[in-house]
Amino acid sequence: MAKPSPTHSGSKQLIALGKAIRELRLESEFSQEALANEIGIDRSYMGGIERGEHNVAIMNLTKIAKTLKIKTSELLAAAGL
């Protein structure tokens, strides 16, 4: 019988990334809903990203960084990754 795949929700890295995204979003004066709309995702999903509940696709990370006017590498560095 196949083992269920492990969940990444709540991992230290995802929590750190979510915290960095939230801090950068607030510094840029975006609401959660406005940032979510800019990158084409639901606000509730954006909230999950910020809480470290979702393993974010690289394309969404790139869109988030671009919208916040930073490089993706800077976003990852802000999270300590």
Residue spans for each PLM region:
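Short basic helix-loop element that most often maps to the first helix and adjoining turn
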Residues: 19-34, 38, 63, 68
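A short, Lys/Arg-rich alpha-helix, primarily the initiator
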Residues: 3-26
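Recognition helix of helix-turn-helix/homeodomain-like DNA-binding domains
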Residues: 40-54
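Short amphipathic alpha-helical segment with a characteristic S/N-K-E followed by hydrophobic residues
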Residues: 55-56, 75
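Conserved hydrophobic/aromatic packing and binding residues within compact polymer-binding modules
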Residues: 21, 35-36, 46-49, 75
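Short C-terminal boundary/hinge segments that cap the last helix of small helical domains
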Residues: 69-81
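Hydrophobic micro-packing sites on short alpha-helices
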Residues: 61-65, 75-76
